[in-house]
């Protein structure tokens, strides 16, 4: 069973933090070819300067397959005076950035929607109006297929992923609510027993 863990970096057990770093490395550094600053380099793991202690994470966890997806949520920082980039928000609107958003479609073809639902739920509870997220054409196609409200934005609005196209996602998502209403999030402590079993199973199976 897939469980969505909600935690902050400061509260994340070291075993889960290491597993997350390895997952991020496999997706973003090895898979997407992103470079890792040398001062943040840990062999086989991916971190960046935005991994602050108060940053929130959603982690999709499967008892046998380990981490299958994630999303990082933090306050969106308006970019500096960059030519060609206009800020698409009213000054009164509260915005979070959702970065490092990924999911293993081979495990669950709709996992991005599940993670996104929990992200907009967290944001709405915190009084946030919109999420800004990096997006791929495939992800935008999935959003359109499942009637997820979003608006394409220009690249450069997400400082932690400034080479990617971005989308503006309102926290009010009726179609996702219909699909996932009642789904809960878990603390790391609730999942840790299965974390230990999974890691032992993985090491024995290699």
Language model segments and positions:
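A short helix-loop-beta-strand connector motif used in the catalytic cores of GNAT acetyltransferases and
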Residues: 47-58, 80
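Conserved beta-strand in the GNAT
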Residues: 59, 65-75
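Extended low-complexity intrinsically disordered regions
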Residues: 74-88
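Acyl-donor binding region in acyl/amide transferases
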Residues: 84-170
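Short, P/G- and charge-enriched loop/turn segments at secondary-structure junctions
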Residues: 43-48, 85-87
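Short amphipathic alpha-helix that is part of the acyltransferase structural core
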Residues: 1-46, 57-61
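Short loop segments at secondary-structure junctions
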Residues: 62-65, 106, 170-175
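Charge-rich, low-complexity intrinsically disordered segments
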Residues: 163-206
């Amino acid at each position: 069973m897939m469980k969505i863990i909600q935690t902050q970096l400061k509260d994340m057990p070291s075993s889960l933090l290491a597993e997350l770093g390895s997952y991020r490395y496999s997706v973003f550094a090895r898979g997407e070819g992103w470079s890792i600053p040398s001062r943040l380099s840990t062999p086989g793991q991916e971190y960046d300067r935005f991994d602050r202690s108060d940053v929130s994470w959603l982690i999709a966890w499967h008892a046998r397959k380990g981490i299958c997806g994630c999303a990082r949520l933090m306050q969106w920082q308006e970019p500096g005076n960059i030519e060609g980039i206009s800020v698409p928000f009213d000054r009164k609107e509260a915005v979070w950035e959702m970065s490092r958003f990924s999911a293993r479609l081979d495990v669950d073809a709709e996992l991005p929607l599940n993670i996104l639902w929990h992200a907009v739920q967290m944001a709405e509870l915190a009084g946030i109006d919109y999420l800004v997220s990096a997006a791929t054409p495939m992800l935008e196609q999935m959003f359109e297929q499942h009637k997820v409200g979003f608006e394409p934005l220009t690249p450069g609005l997400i400082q932690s992923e400034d080479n990617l196209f971005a989308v503006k996602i309102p926290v009010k998502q009726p179609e996702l609510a219909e699909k996932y209403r009642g789904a809960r999030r878990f603390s790391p402590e609730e999942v840790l027993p299965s974390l230990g079993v999974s890691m032992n199973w993985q090491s024995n199976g290699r």
